From Swiss-Prot:
Gene3D superfamilies: 2.30.30.100. GO terms for cellular component: Lsm1-7-Pat1 complex; Lsm2-8 complex; nucleus; P-body; spliceosomal complex. Transmembrane segments: none annotated. This is Sm-like protein LSM6A.
């Protein structure tokens, strides 16, 4: 088993499986520049190009802009993380 696979309840989960499972969910996309984009992941391709909806841009932890749709080129992406929603956030 390679270092990028994870055993979850008896099945092997790859990064591709994770990315498929988060489509339509709230995510944080961190860029190499340190800027964060938070919104709903709508599309992701093989080059890690990302389309998001209801996107907010954070610089140094502070909200700078809000966008309806955002398109991020994959070579700028450091990581993609899911957002844990709380009751106060509307989950």
């Amino acid at each position: 088993m390679s270092g990028v696979e994870e055993k979850v309840s008896g099945t092997t989960k790859t990064p591709a499986d994770f990315l498929k499972s988060i489509r339509g969910r709230p995510v944080v996309v961190k860029l190499n520049s340190g800027v964060d984009y938070r919104g709903t992941l709508t599309c992701l391709d093989g080059y890690m190009n990302i389309a998001m909806e209801q996107t907010e841009e954070y610089v140094n932890g502070q909200l700078k802009n809000k966008y309806g749709d955002a398109f991020i080129r994959g070579n700028n992406v450091l990581y993609i993380s899911t957002v844990n929603m709380t009751v106060a956030d509307g989950a």
